[in-house]
């Protein structure tokens, strides 16, 4: 899997091929791995544990245990963890505390917030999407969380060619605009 903080997307990759894209939400506090920060960590990780087999997609979890309460998407009120939990383990020095920080890929009832940073460090997904992803992957699945666009990766470009050519064109236009800005304003830092 490749997660883009810029795009607020998760791209599922199976056998080296991009399969499906999901809209997600990363942390509203930013990116990083500092303990107690509520940041979304960057880098290489893997799914250490999967929790939620067989429960309804809106099942509320507290401390990774089902409460018996089931919420519909966009239910008013609080924002608990729902549906499924994929607990992440960092594989690099800078994100080695990811498991201890309890950073998950999980469902949210606040689906209207997907596509914008809204979490407290986890990677949030829609209720149906998190069940779909959960069913497609196993423990040990690789996850790469990156700051940049999915289109900066081979997998993202391949997915866009097949499913969203306009996405490729928009990305190319942004790259051209950035280059033009740098040429016309050489003292301005790179965007």
Model-derived segments and spans:
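Electropositive
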Residues: 23-55
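Structural motif
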Residues: 7-9, 44, 85
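A structural motif detector for short, solvent-exposed N-terminal "entry" segments of globular domains
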Residues: 1-30
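Pocket-edge structural micro-motifs
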Residues: 5, 14, 26, 48-49, ...
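Well-ordered beta-strand positions in beta-sheet-rich domains
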Residues: 21-23, 44, 102, 142
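An N-terminal domain-start capping segment
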Residues: 1, 6, 52-58
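Exported/periplasmic cell-wall-interacting domains
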Residues: 34-37, 55-191
């Amino acid at each position: 899997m490749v997660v883009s903080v810029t795009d607020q997307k998760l791209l599922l990759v199976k056998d080296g091929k991009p399969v499906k894209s999901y809209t997600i939400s990363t942390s509203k506090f930013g990116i990083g791995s500092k303990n107690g920060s509520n940041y979304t960590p960057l880098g290489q990780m893997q799914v250490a544990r999967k929790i939620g087999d067989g429960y309804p997609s809106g099942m509320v979890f507290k401390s990774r245990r089902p409460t018996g309460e089931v919420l519909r998407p966009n239910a008013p009120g609080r924002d608990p963890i729902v549906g499924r939990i994929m607990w992440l383990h960092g594989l690099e020095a800078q994100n080695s505390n990811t498991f201890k920080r309890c950073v998950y890929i999980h469902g949210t009832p606040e689906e209207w917030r997907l596509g914008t940073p809204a979490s407290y460090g986890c990677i949030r997904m829609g209720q149906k999407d998190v069940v779909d992803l959960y069913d497609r992957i196993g423990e040990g699945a690789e996850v790469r969380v990156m700051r940049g666009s999915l289109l900066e990766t081979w997998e993202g470009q391949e997915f866009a060619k097949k499913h969203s050519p306009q996405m490729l064109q928009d990305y190319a236009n942004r790259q051209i605009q950035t280059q033009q800005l740098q040429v016309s304003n050489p003292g301005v830092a790179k965007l």
